[in-house]
Swiss-Prot record:
Top-level taxon of the source organism: Eukaryota
Record protein name field: Serpentine receptor class T-55
Entry membrane topology: Multi-pass membrane protein
Subcellular location: Membrane
Cleaved signal peptide residues: 1-18
Keywords, ordered alphabetically: Membrane, Receptor, Signal, Transmembrane, Transmembrane helix
Entry GO CC: membrane
Family to which the UniProt record says this protein belongs: Belongs to the nematode receptor-like protein srt family.
InterPro entries tied to this protein: 7TM_GPCR_serpentine_rcpt_Srt
Transmembrane segments: 70-90, 107-127, 143-163, 187-207, 231-251, 278-298, 303-323
A Pfam family matched in the record: 7TM_GPCR_Srt
Amino acid sequence: MKLRHFLIFLMLIPISSSICFDLKTLQCWPMEIQEMALMLTARNTARYDCSGKSKSEWYETGQKRLGWGIYYISSGLFFQLIGWPVIWVFITKFSMTNALKVYRIMVFIGLIEITEIWGNSVFPGFVAVFGEVYCTSPILMTIVGKMTMVQWVLGSSSAAFLGFHRLCDMIQKLEWLVNTNTKTGLWLTVLFFYACYGSIFFDTVLFNSDYMAPLLDPMIGKQGIIYSNNFLYFHNIIVATTLILVYACLCTLWSSREMNTSSLHVSKFQRSILLQSICISLTYAIPAISFVTMFVLPIPKWFFHVSDITYQLSGGLPFIMYICLNKRVREEFLHLLRVCRKAEKSQVAVIPLGNSTVSAFNN
């Protein structure tokens, strides 16, 4: 009887005509997704309207910086050159089980960083060379902005999780949170969806050649429009604070407790992992702090570029740190270089001489 009355009540409720159920219609999606879809098709919106100037006029609002462009592109390609071999060494030469399963997270972060370099180093280099702004290439700017935001949020939160993972390993009562690969994978999956949410439903960052930094404001000259990203603001605060606190706790625990091992080699190994983790965390903590500073303090124009340099280096410095701090990575990396050089020298040069050929080995 109660169920029948409830159904009658639902039937009598007037359905608002504003409710939209057709997911094929863009207007039925949230406003944030509608705006992103229009930006990805280079269509003007109320907040991202490029109709006020021609493309050549928009180029005049940017600034060509050949020197910085060369730096960004060359450093990005250099990071790619050393980054992929380091990741290859981790994947093929390290047994990522038991004590070494922390390397799974390092490889995950490394894959984020090596792909992020294209968006935070190589692409800004071309933007600097040609003096690009949002309205000169709205589609590309939006795609790169959304992608780099996902990569930054995912990479920095994964770095915080790396510290949390090490802390759980040292505090045995918390080890159950991360003691299986399934649990670790679940944590990283949650962080991935968290990063995608922040990128889709909040204002994106758009690289500007005048400021040489990613900005929320597209610099289209519209008055009274507010561009903000509270998600990114609080994320950077939380990540910076978490990284500092977690690794401070790790260092305190390391210095105060006795290691439950009689092997000096294992002790050095654990110290090496901790040092590598701290270095990775610093490459994320410093840009996060600088980004927060940009939000809360009036800063000079040059500080935008300095902040972006710290962000740009966060994608490549960890690979240099791995080579310098991890003996096995360094040895395997140098071995790969020797193999490549030996392969080049052993190539056969075929020199045509009349009707015959001579094969020469360049050894």
